[in-house]
Amino acid sequence: MGKDSHYSSKKDRVFVRGMQGQYSLREELARLRAMPRVIKGREMKFVDGPQSFSKHFVEPVDGLTQTLHVHLEEYAPGGRTQKHGHVNEAAFYILDGRGYEVHDGVRYDWQAGDVAIVHNNCVHQHFNASPHKPARALVIKTKPMYMFMNMLFQKQVEPRPTEPAAGPEAAAFGARETETDFNH
């Protein structure tokens, strides 16, 4: 980007394009009120793997909410995610385990009880620091709002690992599908 690019300049910009369409608030409220209010996590399955797994509770495609995307991430012992970036922000509430993030080349350590914030347009990757225990995070994103405004952009920089992480715990690890006690 050059010296005069919008990225680094103080030029006036339009951040939100004009939006229009057929929209009845009464019909939309009726549709939303007819949607389920409780998502049964036990009935959902993890996807992805073998080093990081996701269970998507609320996704843009569901039409359940207008502004939120909520999912559970589980990282295998020593596991890592793909390296990627996106315009929407994300908050990771660490449920259990310990690990770290790398955001734009800077490492940030976390443990259970912490909240990791991924800012807009940040290239990031998530890592489980323990070679023996899994880690979990509840993730809340503003992705549907960006989709609605036609401003969503996401890019993968490094793909998701296709092989388990090193070590016997990681090689044998599968997402905890059958867990019944969620009080960690």
Residue ranges: model-predicted function:
Residues 77, 88-99, 104:
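Glycine- and acidic-residue-biased ligand/ion/polar-headgroup-sensing regions
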Residues 87, 106, 122-123, 143:
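A generic "binding-loop/recognition-motif" signal
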Residues 54-58, 70-85:
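Conserved short histidine dyad/triad with adjacent acidic residue
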Residues 81-84, 101-102, 118, 124-131, ...:
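Short beta-strand His + acidic residue motifs that chelate non-heme Fe in jelly-roll/DSBH
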Residues 1-66, 153-184:
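A short, N-terminal "cap"/entry segment at the start of jelly-roll beta-barrel domains
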Residues 67-70, 91-93, 117-118, 132-151:
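A short hydrophobic beta-strand segment most commonly corresponding to one strand
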